[in-house]
Design a protein with these regions (language model features):
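RNA-interacting cores
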Residues: 2-335
Length: 335
């Protein structure tokens, strides 16, 4: 059944507030060139995020990285761009959350030769869109210093718009030239509408495939299999957090039904990362796999489509929670 993507009222639940998909975003694809033969970790998102944060601190921190006692914490570029400070937060958010940006890299290659092309994607939301030059400079300096423990050095060739719409195209950066006129900002609501049109034009059972690990609790336990209620509510929470980030104190709606999972194939997955701020190694754990649905309530579909772009669960800033929706018998899209 066709339906438009609209804001969802929660007055029936007694909350009187509205969750909205009117969230600005921009999706950018970075094309880089390796400057020498190099090794990289199989999972690169955590290294990219950590390296970018380190470069931001080196370039901008004026108080010896003592954030807890910093006089300039409200004006801090790193805090605003890297941790995406929110004036108000949902009750379940207790610490700093990196909700304003996502970095994606699903290239599993570990051996790169000089001149090889290395790609990754960055998606910015809300106020983070205005910090593009901060992210760009950090990634540029990361390329000069080297990525990962083997210091893989690279240079940025291009940064391209990579939105779903034909008008979200164009090259923002080529070499040393920034063409900000090609910086094409979209709205999450438009992304949902166009993805829904494509998905509903196909037949077959609905499916969800996690390309990176999902770390999420259901009934106070970390999931070892997929639960439809958890997936839908997880996507709704991410939309809610982005609403708060843009200044809208939205409430999660009450869903009358959830998709029915007909079959699933799940495996456990983990990612090792090094925390420079804590000077320690840690392992992030989750599950990957695919689930096929026997039903797909339309009230849930907008949120699950949004989740494709914004990711769900814990550790999304380290690349977790990326998935694609599909229809069985049709080709899964590349997002």
């Amino acid at each position: 059944m066709e339906s438009s993507c609209v804001s969802v009222h929660t007055e029936e639940a007694g909350m009187g507030k509205e969750i909205t998909f009117e969230i600005p975003y921009i999706r950018l694809r970075f094309l880089t060139e390796l400057l020498a033969d190099a090794r990289m970790p199989e999972t690169k998102t955590a290294a990219l995020r950590g390296g970018m944060g380190e470069m931001m601190l080196r370039q901008n921190c004026v108080m010896d990285r003592n954030c807890g006692k910093c006089f300039f914490h409200k004006a801090c570029i790193v805090r605003n761009a890297f941790y995406t400070r929110m004036e108000k937060k949902p009750a379940y958010v207790t610490g700093d959350e990196s909700v304003g940006y996502l970095i994606e890299c699903t290239d599993p290659c570990t051996e790169f030769q000089k001149g090889s092309i290395f790609e990754f994607t960055m998606t910015l939301f809300g106020d983070s869109i205005a910090f593009f030059n901060i992210y760009l400079q950090a990634i540029c300096h990361l390329g000069m210093n080297g990525l990962g423990k083997d210091r893989a050095r690279f240079r940025i060739l291009e940064v391209r718009n990579s939105g779903i719409s034909s008008d979200q195209r164009g090259t923002v950066v080529r070499g040393n030239t920034v063409n900000i006129e090609e910086y094409r900002i979209g709205m999450l609501s438009d992304h949902i509408r166009k993805r829904k049109e494509k998905l509903q034009a196909s037949n077959g059972a609905w499916s969800i495939k996690f390309l990176t690990p999902l770390s999420m609790k259901y009934r106070q336990e970390y999931m070892t299999e997929f639960w439809a209620e958890a997936l839908v509510k997880g996507a709704a929470r991410r939309v809610q957090m982005l609403d708060y980030y843009i200044g809208t104190e939205a409430e999660i709606p009450e869903f009358s039904a959830y998709p029915e999972i007909r079959a699933q194939d799940v495996r456990r997955s983990s990612v090792k990362r090094y925390s420079g701020t804590q000077d320690s190694h840690m392992t992030l754990r989750g599950i990957k796999g695919k689930a096929v649905f026997g039903s797909m309530p339309d009230e849930c579909l907008d949120y699950l489509i949004a989740g494709e772009l914004i990711h769900i669960g814990r550790n999304t800033s380290f690349g977790f929670g990326k998935y694609v929706l599909g229809r069985e018998g049709s080709r899964d899209p590349e997002l």
